Regions:
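N-terminal loops that bind phosphate or other acidic moieties
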Residues: 4, 19-161
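Intrinsic low-complexity, disordered N-terminal segments enriched in polar/charged/small residues
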Residues: 13-15
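Cationic, low-complexity basic patches in intrinsically disordered or flexible, solvent-exposed regions
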Residues: 9, 18
Length: 161
């Protein structure tokens, strides 16, 4: 399999280039990521992310089911945050603002330590995987939001020029 470089691909593919520093064996100080979603969507997002950029550390998932005890799930999120926090902060990503996963995550926000980013999508995750080793929490969360918005498109409008 040939690896393509950003210069060889059209558009702004730099957002999708894997960061291979993770595989060099060093323990990195980085922003932790916790994916909290309805059902098992969080696990699938993690699998898709790792398919695109390779294995990731300091990432956890929490699935919220319709019959789950909310206090138990809140504690699961709290434990996941503690597990991925290396001191650079944690971004909790949720699938939909106002939904149960988002509301539980918001109850755990801490200024400059734990932030919640709702509207999870794959471009957002890929961007965060790229920037979380070298960015401050506040910067990374905005970059993730920007990437998530940037890649929402109506194909026919783009192709029509």
């Amino acid at each position: 399999m040939r690896v393509l470089h950003a210069a060889e691909l059209p558009g702004t593919v730099a957002d999708f280039q894997p960061d291979r520093r993770e595989s060099q064996g060093a323990i990195a100080i980085m922003i932790g990521l916790v994916l909290v979603t309805h059902g098992r969507l969080a696990e699938e997002f993690r699998a898709a992310l790792e398919h695109v950029v390779g294995p990731q550390s300091a990432i956890a998932t929490v699935a919220i089911g319709p019959e789950d005890d909310l206090e138990t799930r809140r504690n699961d999120i709290l434990e996941a945050v503690a597990a991925v926090d290396s001191g650079s902060g944690v971004i909790i990503l949720t699938d939909m603002f106002g939904g149960t996963p988002s509301n539980l995550a918001i109850s755990l926000m801490k200024p400059a330590k734990v932030e919640v980013l709702a509207g999870l999508n794959l471009p957002m995750l890929v961007k965060l995987a790229r920037v979380r080793k070298d960015s401050a929490l506040e910067t990374a969360v905005v970059q993730g939001q920007d990437a998530g918005r940037k890649y929402i498109n109506i194909a026919s409008r783009i192709l029509a020029g």
